[in-house]
Amino acid sequence: MLQERLNMLMDDITLQGKKLAKHMDVRDMKRYRELIKQFMNEIVSRSHKFSRENFLDRRGRHRVYGMIKLVDATLDELATELLKDEKDHLIILGKIDEIRGLLLDIFT
């Protein structure tokens, strides 16, 4: 059940990321951020269902929280780029890909 929910959210995030890359609209960014927040909330609230080694770094700390901070920081960078008058499409695409990669890293 959790796996299905995460797969659905990941698909929605991917589609919304494509929409955001195409239109570069603040409303699309807001929806994108909401979907990512839902995904991360599912991961954090139900992380006990995953094996513990998926969430521990080399020092035994929970890796997922560091990854979430990184996703948040990258989302902020993406939002900043979207709000610029001179939007750099390549930077926006790169940030969307980076976020997707981080989410997949958390997910797998």
Where are these regions (language model features)?
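C-terminal or internal capping secondary-structure element at the end of a domain, subdomain, or sheet
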Residues: 74-108
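Short, well-ordered alpha-helical segments
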Residues: 67-75
